[in-house]
């Protein structure tokens, strides 16, 4: 069973989003996503300063099994990327909720409310079978 922290919000496409005290939003992939991918070997992150729309492709995660697109769960400007993942992409497998991908300055913070809570995300994962 996947770990699904209650304090996060989730996209159907398996990204998580965390609202920070400064109003920024940190984004990563869920435990379920990293389990499905297997051993992560490469991560392509968005460029700093890029403006993303909710649901827009933001990067790619490559594992020994497959390559999977990463989507921005909300719209906003990329204000930070986790450069450590370039050297140690496997950190995502070890702790997907510490190994964030990028941070956004949200264009509309209310978009967070449209994401799934932990129970909703668990139901979506269960529905996938």
UniProtKB/Swiss-Prot annotation:
Belongs to the GcvH family. InterPro entries: 2-oxoA_DH_lipoyl-BS (IPR003016), Biotin_lipoyl (IPR000089), GCV_H (IPR002930), GCV_H/Fam206 (IPR033753), GCV_H_sub (IPR017453), Single_hybrid_motif (IPR011053). NCBIfam families: gcvH, PRK01202.1. Binds 1 lipoyl cofactor covalently. The modification N6-lipoyllysine is found at residue 65. Keywords: Lipoyl. GO terms for biological process: glycine decarboxylation via glycine cleavage system. Its cofactor is (R)-lipoate. The glycine cleavage system is composed of four proteins: P, T, L and H. The glycine cleavage system catalyzes the degradation of glycine. The H protein shuttles the methylamine group of glycine from the P protein to the T protein. One of its GO terms (cellular component) is glycine cleavage complex. This is Glycine cleavage system H protein 2. Residues 24-105 form the Lipoyl-binding domain. Pfam families: GCV_H. It comes from Pseudomonas aeruginosa (strain ATCC 15692 / DSM 22644 / CIP 104116 / JCM 14847 / LMG 12228 / 1C / PRS 101 / PAO1).
């Amino acid at each position: 069973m996947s770990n699904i922290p209650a304090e996060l919000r989730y996209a159907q496409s398996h990204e998580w989003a965390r609202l920070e005290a400064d109003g920024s939003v940190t984004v990563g992939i869920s435990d379920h996503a990293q389990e499905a991918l297997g051993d992560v070997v490469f991560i392509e992150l968005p460029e700093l300063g890029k403006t993303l729309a909710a649901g827009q492709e933001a990067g790619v995660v490559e594992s020994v099994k497959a390559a999977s697109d990463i989507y921005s769960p909300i719209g906003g400007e990329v204000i930070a990327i986790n450069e450590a993942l370039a050297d140690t992409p496997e950190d995502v497998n070890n702790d997907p909720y510490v190994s964030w991908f990028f941070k956004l300055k949200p264009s509309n913070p209310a978009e967070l409310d449209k994401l799934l809570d932990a129970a909703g995300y668990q139901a979506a994962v269960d529905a996938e079978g």
